């Protein structure tokens, strides 16, 4: 279960674009209040920019928060802010929630790769990193399918898919204990390399920015 829990961290990393199917309905709704189509589309791409910002801030946050604390905080921020449009259909509040959603995603993304590199080596590490990449694609496909099923209930309902973040949080807390024997080593490594972003993180952030 530990491996499944670790891989589940990547299931929702590119989920900000999963709600695209709901854009027509969202545009129709917010046009009643004077919001343009471009402003509504921004709600989909905004998290991508927040992810990039968080990747730069992570080196500072790591000085006060452990890896486990960052992942838990990221999942809570991701899930809670992701569900806001489900209960509140106010553009400014949704705009803020999408921004926080991206920041939470950035906190998780920063650790989804490194946590595997720290816990596994050799073929296991290579295999797990490959599975992690697949988890992103599978997660995106599942969420997009779920959005399509929820859309007939109204566009606010599609944001319910982000409630899955709480399940991932539960799996992480229950099945991924912090490896005490690696604690000191990881802290030293963090001091040496906290200011640098891993190349996969750079590629991920740049990909989101280009798509947005």
Summary of predicted features, one role per range:
Residues 53-91:
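Conserved MFS/SLC helix-loop-helix module at the cytosolic interface between two early adjacent transmembrane helices
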Residues 91, 97-135:
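Cytoplasmic helix-loop-helix junction between adjacent transmembrane helices
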Residues 7-31, 37, 58:
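Extracytoplasmic
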Residues 177-205:
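Juxtamembrane intracellular "pre-TM" segments in multi-pass secondary transporters
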Residues 35-44, 129:
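Juxtamembrane helix-start elements in MFS-like secondary transporters
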Residues 26-27, 31, 61-62, 146-153:
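Interfacial helix-cap and linker-helix signal at transmembrane-aqueous boundaries
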Residues 131-177:
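Helix-loop-helix hairpin linking two adjacent transmembrane segments in secondary transporters
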Residues 17, 47-56, 140-141:
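Residue-level signature of mid-helix packing/kink "hotspots" within the transmembrane helices
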């Amino acid at each position: 279960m530990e491996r499944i829990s670790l891989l589940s961290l990547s299931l929702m990393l590119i989920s900000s674009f999963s709600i695209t199917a709901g854009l027509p309905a969202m545009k129709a709704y917010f046009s009643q209040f004077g919001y343009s189509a471009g402003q509504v589309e921004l709600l989909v791409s905004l998290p991508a920019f927040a992810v990039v910002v968080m990747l730069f801030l992570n080196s500072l946050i790591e000085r006060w928060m452990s890896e486990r604390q960052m992942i838990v905080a990221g999942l809570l921020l991701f899930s809670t802010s992701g569900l806001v449009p489900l209960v509140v259909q106010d553009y400014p509040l949704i705009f803020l929630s999408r921004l926080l959603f991206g920041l939470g995603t950035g906190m998780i993304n920063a650790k989804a790769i490194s946590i595997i590199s720290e816990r596994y080596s050799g073929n296991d590490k290579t295999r797990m990193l490959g599975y992690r990449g697949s988890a992103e694609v599978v997660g995106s496909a599942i969420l997009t399918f779920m959005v399509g099923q929820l859309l007939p209930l109204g566009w606010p309902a599609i944001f319910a898919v982000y409630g899955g973040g709480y399940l991932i949080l539960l799996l992480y807390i229950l099945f991924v204990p912090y490896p005490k024997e690696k604690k000191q080593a990881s802290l030293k490594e963090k001091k040496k390399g906290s200011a640098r972003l891993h190349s996969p993180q750079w590629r991920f952030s740049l990909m989101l920015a280009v798509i947005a």
